[in-house]
From Swiss-Prot:
Belongs to the ABC transporter superfamily. GO terms for molecular function: ATP binding; ATP hydrolysis activity; ATPase-coupled transmembrane transporter activity. GO terms for cellular component: ATP-binding cassette (ABC) transporter complex. InterPro entries: AAA+_ATPase, ABC_transporter-like_ATP-bd, ABC_transporter-like_CS, Metal_Ion_Import_ABC, P-loop_NTPase. Gene3D superfamilies: P-loop containing nucleotide triphosphate hydrolases. It is a peripheral membrane protein. Part of an ATP-driven transport system CT_415/CT_416/CT_417 for a metal. Probably responsible for energy coupling to the transport system. The keyword Membrane applies. This is Probable metal transport system ATP-binding protein CT_416. PROSITE patterns: ABC_TRANSPORTER_1 (PS00211), ABC_TRANSPORTER_2 (PS50893). It comes from Chlamydia trachomatis serovar D (strain ATCC VR-885 / DSM 19411 / UW-3/Cx). The keyword Cell membrane applies.
C-alpha cells in the first residue's frame, strides 16, 4: 500500500486562546482506503477535513501528502456538506460540473475540449448525463448531491473527501451515491464523514472516530451507534 496522507500530532483551535477543536491527531491514509469518519456533532470532523484540504492551518503538528503520480502534488476532490447557491441563477448541470475544472483553466480562461470531456465523464459516472443541459436549481436534493460529487470528480482526483454526502436525501439517491463511491474506490482513496452508520459502515475498510482526538477502528463489522455510545460515551 502507498501512503497518501500522514497527520502527525495535529492540533487546531480558533483564535489564540480558544479550546482545541482538534487535539494531537495522528493517522495515516493509504492508497485505496475507504475510510468513514464518525463522531458527535462538534467533535471536529469537518475541521479535520478542512485541515487535510489545507483550508485551515494547524497550530501544531504536520500534515504531509504523497501522490502516486510522480512529481505531482496529491490531487484532492472535496464534496462539502452545505452548498449555497442562488436558485434564480440560470446555470446548467454541466456548467456546475465544469466549475470543478476552474483550477486547471489555461491563462486565457476558457474551458478546453479536455475540460468538457472530463465534465461529461463525471456526469456519466454519477448517472446524470441526461440532465447535463437541465437547470441545476430544478434538480432534487439527491440529484444535486450527485452533481456536487461530479463537480469534484471533474478534476480527476486521486483522493476524495466528502462531508455527509448521504445526509437529508431520499433512500434511492443515498444508495446510488454509495454504489458510485464503492466503484470509484477501485482507483480513488476516499474519506467520508457520516452519521448514517446503518447504511454506510459496510463500505469502509477503516473507521476514524473523531471527538477532538482520533481513534481508529479497524473492524468495521462491529460498528454501530450503540457501540460508539458504549465505547466512547458519545454517539455519532
Amino acid at each position: 500500500m502507498t501512503k497518501q496522507m500522514l497527520l502527525e500530532n495535529v492540533s487546531f483551535r480558533y483564535g489564540k486562546t480558544g479550546p482545541l477543536i482538534v487535539d494531537h491527531v495522528s493517522c495515516e491514509v493509504y492508497s485505496g482506503d475507504f475510510i468513514g469518519i464518525i463522531g458527535p456533532n462538534g467533535g471536529g470532523k469537518t475541521t479535520l477535513t478542512q485541515l487535510m484540504l489545507g483550508l485551515l492551518q494547524p497550530v501544531c503538528g504536520s500534515i504531509s501528502t504523497y501522490s502516486v503520480q510522480d512529481h505531482r502534488p496529491l490531487s484532492i476532490g472535496w464534496v462539502p456538506q452545505h452548498f449555497s447557491y442562488d436558485a434564480a441563477f440560470p446555470i446548467t448541470v454541466k456548467e456546475t460540473v465544469l466549475s470543478g475544472r476552474l483550477a486547471t483553466l489555461p491563462w486565457y480562461g476558457r474551458y478546453t475540449q479536455e475540460d468538457h470531456e472530463a465534465a461529461e465523464e463525471a456526469l456519466l459516472t454519477v448517472d446524470l448525463i441526461d440532465y447535463k443541459d437541465s437547470c441545476f436549481s430544478h434538480l432534487s436534493g439527491g440529484q444535486i448531491q450527485r452533481v456536487l460529487l461530479a463537480r469534484a470528480l471533474a478534476a480527476r482526483p486521486e483522493f476524495l473527501l466528502l462531508d455527509e454526502p448521504t445526509a437529508n436525501i431520499d433512500p434511492v439517491n443515498q444508495q446510488k451515491i454509495l454504489q458510485i463511491l464503492s466503484a470509484l474506490n477501485k482507483h480513488c482513496t476516499i474519506l467520508m464523514i457520516t452519521h448514517d452508520l446503518h447504511h454506510t459502515a459496510g463500505c469502509f475498510n477503516r473507521v476514524f472516530f473523531m471527538n477532538k482526538t482520533l481513534t481508529t477502528l479497524a473492524d468495521t463489522t462491529t460498528i454501530s451507534e450503540r457501540f460508539c455510545c458504549n465505547t466512547f460515551g458519545r454517539c455519532p
